[in-house]
Amino acid sequence: RGSXLTILPLRNIRDIFYVG
């Protein structure tokens, strides 16, 4: 899931983890 992708803004990180 959103590994790595933490490079994006916190706002997008939340969507990444949710969509993960």
Curated annotation (Swiss-Prot):
Its main location: secreted. It is found in: Secreted, Extracellular space. N-glycosylated. Its EC number is 3.4.23.-. Expressed in chorionic epithelium (trophectoderm). It comes from the Eukaryota. One of its GO terms (cellular component) is extracellular region. Keywords: Aspartyl protease, Glycoprotein, Hydrolase, Protease, Secreted. GO terms for biological process: proteolysis. GO terms for molecular function: aspartic-type endopeptidase activity. The keyword Protease applies. It is an enzyme of class 3 (hydrolase). Belongs to the peptidase A1 family. This is Pregnancy-associated glycoprotein 61C.
